Amino acid sequence: SLVFSPEIDELSKPNKIVSLYDPCCGTGGMLTVGKNWIKENISKDVEVNMFGQELNPQTYSICKSDFLITNEQPENIKLGSTLSKDGYQDTNRKFDYMICNPPYGVSWKKDEKYVKNESKEPDGRFSVGIPRTSDGQLLFLQHMISKMEPSGSRIGCLLYTSDAADDWSS
């Protein structure tokens, strides 16, 4: 709700169409929850087009199947590593809203060559810096920033930090 609440007036406009993107969508659960929250709490008339990308072939298949069953647009879900092969790069697609829960502590070593090369490009997704290869959460955040509409977008990203596991969080 933090992503959408400040936009209630904008989302309540007649014939409103918005895009919702998750770069590590898994089975599509966060996308579905986001769309349902907008429909139930803001306006059932908003058209929410969902987009996502998933690395794991099994969870990708579940997401595509769910989209088929629920009459969504399964072609909007891409297979592959968001970090090394942006599924929306060819169209330079931007999104109104982006949500994700990137994998914590997952190595991006397989994508290292591509990520490092792109980090050297002034307009590259990762040009502000790259984290250690043992945890790529911040790469997903940088990726989403690159997908923002020129007029602005809203991002909700659940990042895990080691502080969350320390005594401070008790």
Predicted stretch roles:
Residues 23, 53, 78-80, 100-107, ...:
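Generic beta-strand/beta-sheet core signal
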Residues 160-170:
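Single conserved hydrophobic/aromatic residue that forms the stacking wall/gate
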Residues 88-97:
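A short acidic, Gly/Pro-enriched loop at the edge of an enzyme's catalytic core
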Residues 104-139, 154-162:
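Mobile active-site "lid"/loop adjacent to the S-adenosyl-L-methionine
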Residues 143:
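Short, conserved SAM-binding segment of the class I
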Residues 64-89:
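S-adenosyl-L-methionine
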Residues 148-150:
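Helix-to-beta-strand junctions that scaffold the AdoMet/dcAdoMet cofactor pocket
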Residues 1-42, 48, 53, 59, ...:
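Class I S-adenosyl-L-methionine
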